[in-house]
């Protein structure tokens, strides 16, 4: 159903990404107790923390872009997950984009990642730590076959399934977005232990990484959570609908004007940028 829409969505995302956003002018976190504000795709954060760039279990990619900030809950999740992976001898976790120092809208690449509760993690676990040059210009491993319906068998491994499962089993995680072909492979690999699959949601792109989203933290009273995923493992008709051809007469998505910022985020911009 959705294969032909992927390129269109990518074009829309890039078209809306040409203009810089005022959030990029904020170079340091806003002081105060940690507060995620607004929705994942329209919000900001006060009291963000920088993910430590030196760690045993993970490495941070593209540090020159300074997208390694998030709510303390997100920093702690990354540390928990990478410690689990390291203790199991699975390899090094590769951390991609989190958020900017005050969150807010990016000028490209993401619609969400605005409240300090989202992180992209590569779906590869190198046994040898990457060099500085590799981290600055990372080579993503496209796990999805050219037909868009299956993973590439030679690139898939049980460790990738285990990495996603470990993340999904974390109580703070509400959703993990992966390509539909990757979700399908997880459904095949899961066996009888399937409860965690409910959190793994098929979505456009996401061929080489998973996008992990946490719940709104306790105390972040202006944070807007999503409704829980539908009951079940998500491996049935819903998943298969992603592989169906588009219906006759279907039209490409229309680029939407971003909604107004939450008042607290607008006030933050007014004070620190505008």
Swiss-Prot record:
**Range of residues in the leader sequence:** 1-19
Query: Where does it localize?
Result: Periplasm
What EC identifiers does the entry list? Answer: 3.4.24.-
Please list the coiled coil stretches: none
Report the cofactor remark: Binds 2 Zn(2+) ions per subunit. Zn(2+) ion 1 is bound in the active site. Zn(2+) ion 2 is bound at the dimer interface by residues from both subunits.
Q: Which residues participate in Zn(2+) 1 binding?
A: 110, 113, 120, 211
The main location is periplasm
Where do transmembrane segments lie in this chain? none
Q: Which cysteines are joined by disulfide bonds?
A: 44-265, 187-235, 216-223
Quote any Pfam family the record assigns: Peptidase_M74
Q: Which keywords belong to this entry? A: Disulfide bond, Hydrolase, Metal-binding, Metalloprotease, Periplasm, Protease, Signal, Zinc
Q: Which cofactor(s) does the record list? A: Zn(2+)
Q: In which family does this protein belong, per the annotation? A: Belongs to the peptidase M74 family.
State whether it acts alone or in a complex, and with which partners, per the record: Dimer.
Query: Can you say what this protein is called?
Result: Penicillin-insensitive murein endopeptidase
- Species this chain originates from: Klebsiella pneumoniae (strain 342)
What gene is it encoded by? Answer: mepA
